């Protein structure tokens, strides 16, 4: 444990070195969380754009594979799953708030393929966009 390690240090310098290492590890963990938070912020802000993990990782100066692993570890979801959840959440709001066509809603939330939009919507909501809209009417 940390207490035993501190007690076992022989000199004040050893103690300082140990504490510096612990703080460094702690800050490294915080930076990882900060990177994931930045990704979540980008998804929340720009979900309707053509987003990719590769592009975001370039902005953050971090390896895309590593960033994908961090996202999975921190959120228990992949980048694509998080993006789809955000887009579908926005689509649900548009479907209920506006009378836009389902195709228009699809494009408004960032999908370029209506068939794929239907597939993802059904997977996450358990029903088609049309059925989702009708349930409230």
Listing of model-derived features with the role each one plays in the protein:
Residues 59, 108-109, 124:
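Residues within the alpha-helical elements of helix-turn-helix
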Residues 46-51, 78-79, 128-129:
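Short helix/strand-capping hinge loops at secondary-structure junctions
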Residues 54, 65, 101-104, 114-115, ...:
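Residues within helix-turn-helix
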Residues 53-55, 61, 118:
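C-terminal amphipathic alpha-helical interaction region
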Residues 1-38, 60, 73-81, 85:
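Short, Lys/Arg-enriched, Trp-marked, Pro/Gly-tolerant hinge/linker segments that flank
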């Amino acid at each position: 444990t940390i207490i035993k390690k501190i007690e076992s240090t022989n000199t004040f310098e050893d103690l300082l070195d140990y504490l510096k290492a612990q703080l460094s590890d702690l800050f490294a963990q915080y930076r990882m969380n900060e990177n994931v938070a930045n990704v979540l912020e980008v998804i929340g802000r720009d979900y309707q754009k053509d987003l990719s993990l590769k592009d975001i990782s370039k902005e953050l100066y971090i390896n895309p594979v590593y960033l994908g692993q961090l996202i999975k570890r921190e959120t228990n979801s992949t980048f694509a799953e998080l993006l789809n959840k955000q887009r579908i959440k926005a689509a649900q709001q548009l479907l209920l708030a506006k009378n836009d066509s389902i195709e228009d809603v699809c494009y408004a939330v960032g999908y370029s393929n209506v068939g794929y939009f239907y597939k993802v919507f059904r997977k996450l909501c358990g029903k088609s966009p049309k059925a989702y809209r009708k349930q409230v009417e």
